[in-house]
Swiss-Prot record:
Belongs to the CCZ1 family. GO terms for biological process: vesicle-mediated transport. Pfam families: Intu_longin_1, Intu_longin_2, Intu_longin_3. This is Vacuolar fusion protein CCZ1 homolog. Keywords: Lysosome, Membrane. InterPro entries: Ccz1, CCZ1/INTU/HSP4_longin_1, CCZ1/INTU/HSP4_longin_3, CCZ1/INTU_longin_2. Transmembrane segments: none annotated. One of its GO terms (cellular component) is Mon1-Ccz1 complex. The keyword DNA repair does not apply. The keyword Glycoprotein does not apply.
Length: 471
C-alpha cells in the first residue's frame, strides 16, 4: 500500500507467517517435518526449511542469556520478525516488511526503510491475537495432536490461517491491538436490571444454554464467559461477524420482520449464525463451534448469535447437543419479541441520557482509556475499527508517541505519568495508575505544563468517575 504525496511511502506488510515445532524433525534430512504451516505456500521447500532453521537458531541462541524468556523479535533493515511460543514446543513466527519511503535523490530512486515506525509491542500483540483467534475456533494445538496427530493439526492450521491472514491489515494496527480490550455500553441501573432479568428468563426457558453474552451497538453489557474467552469472542464479533450485517436498524425505521406475531408484539429478531430460513424444515445449517476454558475444563460449544435492532445476544450451548430447526423456531419465537422490546428500551434510555448531557461542542482533547482488571476500553481517537481498516482521527506521528509511552509503562511496575510535546505542538499525556492506563492528546498549543496537568485532572473527574454505569 502506497500513500499519496511527493515521496511514495509504503506501509508495513506481511512477508511471511509460519508455525513449526523443532521436536517433529530432530534428525538431519527430516527438517520439513518441523513445518506445520507456512505462508506464502509458493515459497520453495528449501527456503522454508532455511527460514525455520534460522528462527530456531535465534531462539536457541537467546535462550543462553535468558532460558525462560527467549527472543520476542529480531530487527533488520528491511523487515522485523516476531516470535511467539503459545504452547510448549510450538512456535509462531510473523515477518513484517518495514515501512519504506521511496525518494528521488540526484535523479535516482532511493529506498529508505523506516524501521523505527514499527512498534514491537503492537505487532507482538497481533501475533498473540492470531493464536487466540485460532484457539477460539479450533482448540489448542496439543488437543489436535491428541485427537488426530500432526496431519489433523496441519489441516486445521491451513484451513484457518489461509483465510485469517487475509484479514490482517498491519498498516492499521495500533495501541488498541496491544490492549485487546472490550468496549462496555453505559447503562443506568434500571435498564441493566432489565437486561439481567431478560437473560435469566431465557436461560430458564432454554435450559441447555450454558453461557450468554449481551451486546448493544457493538458494546458489551453482560457476559457469562471468563474474561479471556470473552475478550477474543468480542474481537471476532465486532471486527468480523457484525460488520457483515451492518444496516439501518433503528426502531420504527422499517416495518417489523414478522408483523403476524400474536398479541400485536413486534418482532425484529433474526439469526446471524445458523439457519437463514426458519420456514424451511429441510434447510441444512450449522452453528460455528468455539472452544472456551481451554486451560481448565476445555469446553466445545455451539455459538448462536441472535440480533434484534441494535441488540445482539450470544447463546452458547454444549457442542454434543444436536440443534434442530424446531429448537431454532422456539428460540426465535421466545427471544425475538422480548429482545425487540428490550432493544427499544435501551435505545430510549441512551437517547434521553444524550439529551440530558446536551450537545457539547467538540472537545479539545481525544483519549484512549484501558482498565487491566475488567478489560474495559474506551477511545475517542478511533472512529472505526474493522478488519479492513482502523480510522483514527489523529496523525500517525501522535499514534506512534502513544505506543512509545505504553512501551515505557511496560518496563516499570510503579504508577507514573509521562507528558510529551509533539513536533506538531500537540500535547500527549500518558497516565498509569492502579491497573488503569489513560492516554490523552490535547490540542492546546499555547498551554504550559501546569495547565496541561490541570486539564488532565478535569478530564479524569468528568469521564472516569464511573466507567460502567451512568448514575
Amino acid at each position: 500500500m502506497a500513500f499519496a504525496g511527493q515521496d511514495k511511502r509504503y506501509a508495513p506488510s506481511l512477508l511471511s507467517f509460519f508455525i513449526y515445532n523443532p521436536k517433529f524433525g530432530p534428525r538431519e534430512g527430516e527438517e520439513e517435518k518441523k513445518i506445520l504451516f507456512y505462508h506464502p505456500n509458493e515459497v520453495e521447500q528449501n527456503e522454508k526449511i532455511r527460514n525455520v532453521g534460522l528462527c530456531e537458531a535465534i531462539v536457541q541462541f537467546t535462550r543462553t542469556f535468558n532460558p525462560t524468556k527467549p527472543a520476542k523479535s529480531l530487527h533488520t533493515q528491511k523487515n522485523r520478525q516476531f516470535f511467539h511460543e503459545p504452547e510448549e514446543g510450538f512456535w509462531m513466527v510473523m515477518v513484517v516488511k518495514n515501512p519504506v519511503a521511496e525518494k528521488q535523490k540526484d535523479g535516482k530512486t532511493v529506498l529508505e526503510y523506516q524501521e523505527d515506525e514499527l512498534l514491537d509491542k503492537v505487532y507482538s500483540s497481533v501475533l498473540q491475537q492470531c493464536y487466540r483467534m485460532y484457539k477460539l475456533f479450533n482448540g489448542t494445538f496439543g488437543r489436535a495432536m491428541e485427537v488426530g496427530q500432526v496431519e489433523l493439526l496441519k489441516d486445521r492450521l491451513e484451513k484457518f490461517f489461509h483465510r485469517y491472514l487475509q484479514t490482517l491489515h498491519l498498516h492499521s494496527c495500533d495501541l488498541l491491538d496491544v490492549f485487546g480490550g472490550i468496549s462496555f455500553f453505559p447503562l443506568d441501573k434500571m435498564t441493566y436490571l432489565k437486561v439481567q432479568s431478560f437473560i435469566n428468563r431465557i436461560e430458564e426457558s432454554l435450559n441447555i444454554v450454558k453461557y450468554t453474552a449481551f451486546l448493544y451497538n457493538d458494546q458489551l453489557i453482560w457476559s457469562g464467559l471468563e474474561q479471556e474467552d470473552m475478550r477474543i469472542l468480542y474481537k471476532y464479533l465486532t471486527t468480523t461477524l457484525f460488520p457483515r450485517y451492518t444496516e439501518p436498524e433503528l426502531a420504527g425505521r422499517d416495518s417489523p420482520i414478522r408483523p403476524e406475531m400474536p398479541g400485536n408484539l413486534q418482532h425484529y429478531g433474526r439469526f446471524l449464525t445458523g439457519p437463514l430460513n426458519l420456514n424451511d424444515s429441510e434447510v441444512k445449517f450449522r452453528f460455528p463451534k468455539i472452544f472456551v476454558n481451554t486451560e481448565d475444563s476445555y469446553e466445545e460449544l455451539h455459538l448462536i448469535v441472535y440480533k434484534a435492532m441494535s441488540a445482539s445476544v450470544c447463546f452458547m450451548i454444549d457442542a454434543s447437543v444436536q440443534l434442530t430447526v424446531d429448537f431454532c423456531r422456539k428460540l426465535d419465537s421466545l427471544v425475538g419479541p422480548q429482545l425487540t422490546v428490550l432493544a427499544s428500551d435501551i435505545c430510549e434510555q441512551y437517547n434521553s441520557n444524550r439529551r440530558i448531557s446536551g450537545s457539547e461542542k467538540e472537545p479539545q482533547f481525544k483519549f484512549i482509556y484501558f482498565n487491566h482488571m475488567n478489560l474495559a476500553e474506551k477511545s475517542t481517537i478511533h472512529l472505526r475499527k474493522t478488519p479492513n481498516m482502523s480510522l483514527t482521527s489523529v496523525q500517525p506521528e501522535l499514534m506512534k508517541i502513544l505506543g512509545d509511552i505504553n512501551s515505557d509503562f511496560t518496563r516499570v511496575d510503579e504508577d507514573e505519568e509521562i507528558i510529551v510535546k509533539a513536533m506538531s505542538d500537540y500535547w500527549v499525556v500518558g497516565k498509569k495508575s492502579d491497573q488503569r492506563e489513560l492516554y490523552v492528546i490535547l490540542n492546546q498549543k499555547n498551554s504550559n505544563l501546569i495547565e496541561v496537568n490541570e486539564e488532565i485532572k478535569k478530564l479524569c473527574a468528568t469521564h472516569f468517575s464511573n466507567i460502567f454505569f451512568l448514575d
